[in-house]
A protein has these predicted regions:
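Short, hydrophobic/aromatic-rich segments at coil-to-beta transitions
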Residues: 254-262
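Residue-level recognition of short loop/turn positions
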Residues: 150, 276-277
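Short, surface-exposed beta-strand/loop micro-motifs that present aromatic residues
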Residues: 260, 267-276
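Well-ordered beta-strand positions enriched in small/hydrophobic/aromatic, beta-favoring residues
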Residues: 173, 245, 261, 281-283, ...
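Generic C-terminus detector
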Residues: 287-309
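Short helix-loop-beta-strand segments that form the rim/entrance of peptidase-like active sites
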Residues: 3
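Short, well-ordered beta-strand elements
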Residues: 271-272, 278-288
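Short, surface-exposed loop or secondary-structure junction motifs
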Residues: 6-253
Length: 309
């Protein structure tokens, strides 16, 4: 795989729907051909044009009009979506990483689960990270909770499909804080884990480089309130994207260095990796919708305390 080779050379079905240009009077989608092919770099930087329906009213409308299943179903048809814009022309957080998972499977000849275990989880000692729950993991599984209109939390049923048609590169792993911190420390240490080197230092440097150029990460506006609130990690601040991390272009109010790496998971799980300060932090909860005000406040307070003089 190379970053700028057309992805269709590996997964021919990618981008087949073209770009969503609007809807006709009957509410059916109007599609056009994209101006250029999607590359791996587009997918990793969320500039491919793909979007999640929870942050795109147009994709949510398309999915409803066409009967396309949700990504969370684990069905291959869920990835058969149009683009919001021509590749490379804007930023939208979406299913591009799921397509990267498909590319990895195509070139490795392994399932995504087997490949990640071999090259990442096993070398890092991430013994509790997997797509499918073992019985001993299920016994320790933290339940998901929903935040109601009154602010109270209540248990809700939530589980990713255990035998899906595809494992999502963009989500679906179970794990622990200890496991994920092993990954974060490896990135913080320039690709090394103890005496083992998993990634070249120059690879990590490229991963940590802002790839967006004149583009920028924009606030994510919710179109599915049950899944996510509006999300803006650094209000009023410019942000970029690496391979594949959120990058704050200026120092944050929490003391995070400019150029640090971060991202999150749907259940209000958050992390940062700050090469400037030499720190990394993990915050895990199991709450929906995403970007819960109390959870993000606790995460910010946690980072502020870590960075305090």
């Amino acid at each position: 795989l190379t970053l700028d080779t057309p992805a269709a050379a590996v997964v021919p079905e990618i981008g087949a729907k073209g770009v969503l240009a609007g809807f006709d009077e009957a509410g059916q989608p109007i599609l056009r051909q994209a101006k250029r092919p999607i590359t791996l770099r587009h997918l990793l930087t969320h500039t491919s044009g793909y979007a999640y329906d929870m942050w795109s009213a147009d994709i949510a409308r398309y999915r409803k009009a066409t009967g396309t299943p949700a990504v969370g179903t684990g069905r291959n048809a869920a990835l058969d979506l149009p683009l919001l814009f021509d590749p490379g022309e804007d930023w939208s957080y979406g299913i591009g990483i799921d397509w990267v998972g498909k590319m990895i499977e195509a070139v490795s000849g392994e399932t995504l689960s087997a490949h990640l275990s071999r090259v990442l989880f096993d070398p890092l000692g991430m013994v509790d990270t997997s797509f499918k729950l073992r019985p001993d993991q299920r016994a320790r599984l933290a339940g998901m909770h929903g935040r109601g209109p009154d602010g109270a939390l209540a248990p809700i049923a939530f589980e990713t499909p255990q035998d899906p048609e595809f494992h999502g590169g963009g989500g679906g792993l179970y794990g622990t804080a200890r496991d994920y911190l092993a990954f974060a420390r490896m990135i913080l240490n320039g690709g090394k884990h103890g005496g083992l080197r998993l990634l070249k230092a120059e690879t990590v440097a490229e991963m940590a480089r802002d790839q967006l150029g004149p583009l920028a990460v924009r606030p994510m506006r919710s179109s599915v309130p049950s899944a996510t609130n509006d999300a803006d990690f650094f209000p009023g601040m410019p942000n970029g994207w690496g391979l594949t991390f959120l990058i704050n272009r200026k120092p944050s109010p929490q003391g995070r260095s400019a150029g640090a790496l971060a991202w999150a998971g749907l259940g209000n799980t958050f992390y940062w990796i700050d090469h400037g300060r030499g720190t990394a932090g993990i915050f895990l909860s199991q709450i929906l919708p995403f970007f819960d005000a109390k959870a993000i406040s606790l995460f910010r307070d946690f980072e502020t305390m870590v960075n305090a003089p």
